[in-house]
Amino acid sequence: MAAEIILETKDLGINFSGLKAVDGVNFRLREGEIRSVIGPNGAGKTTFFNLLAGNLRPTKGEIWFRGKNIAGVPQHKICRKGITKSHQITSIFPGLSVFENIRLSAQMRVTQYNFWGEYRRIDKVNEKVMSILEEIGLTDKKNRVAANLTYGDQRYLEIGITLATDPVILLLDEPTAGMTPAETRETMKLIQKLAKKLTIVIVEHDMSVVWGISHYITVLHNGATLAEGTPPEIKNNDDVRRVYLGGH
């Protein structure tokens, strides 16, 4: 039995000064899926991500999440509902320790509901942080200042920060950008592990990553959906090969 549709866009679009950056995208995401969104530069991938995350307000269309249309809902409210986006450029507090970075995110999640209650539950917050550190493989570096981490570990930390918000859907923008091959392999393993309890959407240019971890792939071109399918289907799609894949 197929998993339930957890997120769906209907005729989603946004214009910038008359330019259609995203143009009528219909997108259906199933619970527990790893979905890759690919396409050439300027295809609208990051803009589409920003629409899903609430960073941009669509010009047209709908975004349905758990039975509610969230199109145009501000980013902080969408995050609270369970859709969290990481960034293409690492976004951490460099002067804080690894532990403090994640704890800050976890505390903000708690204080959205009960500011003073957070202090009574500080032990639970710390337990949550330690659990996340173990999940992302940074337990032994919890006291290290974030600025002193390797680039790859900084990206893992950013994923940890997003996990502290208790996401249902995790949007990862170029999660392996700038990583060494070894770091990329570890990140692929981490994403696959996280997908056992989360639904994950990634924008990624490294096709070895896309082929290696995706359950399903959406290809955007000129802001519109060019093709969707499993990795083998996309590999063998003539339109995709012509527009994007080339020699991949």
Question: What are the language-model segments listed below?
Answer:
Residues A2-H248:
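Glycine-rich phosphate-binding loops of nucleotide-dependent enzymes
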